[in-house]
């Protein structure tokens, strides 16, 4: 089980790759009067510098071993992040490929015209089954997964979260909801796994049915922040609120993008600080793990969205 536990990296050996932080402005294709939509901004960064060749090989929708997607249908909008478990590197396996393939399958299902976003956990189940049963199966590894959907007809948010990626919803400058982590033990999140050999019994194999599902009604101006643990392990909730409070009701994509950029920059800075008392360091202490103080270098992926309901005719 050792290679499914995230390694506590030597923080001095990693340099965050600023050049790999790619800016993206995305908004929903749905613009009909009265139809709810999410105005989205995406940003991220890899914890390790990548060459131009590596960037071309891993393609879009990846920041290191993190991956993400967004999709839109007449009835739903869907956002997802996955964090490949880096311990597989000891076996020469790039868990980022697993995360990317999982998100790719989620995107394919979520882009079907009839998809309504009411059951993101079933979306995760179907996507994992497709990945697991794909032939030839040349993808192995494991990752966390967090899916968030907007069901347009009743303006309701639905979610499915497995592991320690997560999301929070802010309204009027306060946290309305935050997802809970799922951990086997410290730094060992629940994870979906396809081992290189079916008989391999020394790896964690959690089920997508174990993903925690929630739903709550949204209001215009609500903010949804979806991210991998590279953000949450380094930026306390109070700092997140301070960064986002001024965005309440903001639906201009450029302002959301600037905020997403600031969040990633803040997480990168704190992740390499030797003196900051990070959420990760506090959790380590609570679990009697000798980590000391400081941040946790990691890949970071952030999707920031604001709910807009255009005026009805």
UniProtKB/Swiss-Prot annotation:
The keyword Transferase does not apply. InterPro entries: PPM-type-like_dom_sf (IPR036457), PPM-type_phosphatase-like_dom (IPR001932), PPTC7 (IPR039123). Its cofactor is Mg(2+); Mn(2+). One of its GO terms (molecular function) is protein serine/threonine phosphatase activity. Its EC number is 3.1.3.16. It comes from the Eukaryota. The keyword Manganese applies. Mn(2+) 2 binds at residues 83, 229. SUPFAM superfamilies: PP2C-like. Mn(2+) 1 binds at residues 83-84. Residues 47-307 form the PPM-type phosphatase domain. One of its GO terms (biological process) is dephosphorylation. It catalyses: O-phospho-L-seryl-[protein] + H2O = L-seryl-[protein] + phosphate; O-phospho-L-threonyl-[protein] + H2O = L-threonyl-[protein] + phosphate. GO terms for cellular component: mitochondrion. CDD domains: PP2Cc. Keywords: Hydrolase, Magnesium, Manganese, Metal-binding, Protein phosphatase. Belongs to the PP2C family. This is Protein phosphatase PTC7 homolog fig. It comes from Drosophila virilis (Fruit fly).
């Amino acid at each position: 089980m050792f290679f499914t536990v995230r390694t506590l990296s030597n923080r001095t050996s990693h340099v965050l790759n600023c050049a790999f932080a790619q800016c993206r402005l995305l908004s929903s294709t749905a613009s009909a009067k009265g139809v709810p939509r999410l105005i989205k901004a995406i940003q991220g960064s890899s914890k390790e510098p990548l060459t131009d060749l590596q960037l071309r090989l891993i393609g879009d929708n990846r920041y290191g071993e993190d991956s993400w997607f967004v999709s839109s249908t007449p009835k739903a909008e869907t956002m997802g992040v996955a964090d490949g478990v880096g311990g597989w590197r000891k076996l020469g396996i790039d868990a980022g490929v697993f995360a990317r393939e999982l998100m790719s399958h989620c995107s394919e299902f979520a882009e079907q015209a009839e998809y309504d976003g009411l059951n993101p956990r079933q979306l995760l189940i179907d996507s994992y089954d497709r990945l697991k049963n794909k032939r030839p199966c040349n993808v192995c590894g494991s990752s966390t997964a967090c899916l968030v959907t907007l069901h347009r007809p009743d303006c309701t948010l639905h979610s499915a979260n497995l592991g320690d990626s997560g999301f929070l919803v802010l309204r009027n400058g306060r946290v309305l909801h935050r997802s809970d982590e799922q951990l086997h033990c410290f730094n060992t999140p629940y994870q979906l796994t396809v081992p290189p050999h079916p008989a391999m019994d020394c790896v964690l194999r959690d089920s997508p049915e174990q993903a925690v599902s929630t739903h709550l009604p949204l209001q215009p101006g609500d903010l949804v922040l979806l991210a991998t643990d590279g953000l949450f392990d380094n930026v306390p909730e109070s700092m997140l609120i301070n960064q986002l409070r001024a965005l309440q009701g903001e639906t201009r994509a450029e302002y959301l993008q600037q905020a997403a950029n600031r969040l990633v920059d803040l997480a990168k800075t704190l992740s390499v600080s030797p003196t900051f008392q990070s959420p990760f360091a506090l959790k380590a202490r609570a679990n009697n793990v000798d980590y000391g103080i400081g941040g946790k270098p990691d890949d970071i992926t952030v999707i920031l969205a604001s709910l807009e309901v255009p005026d009805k005719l």
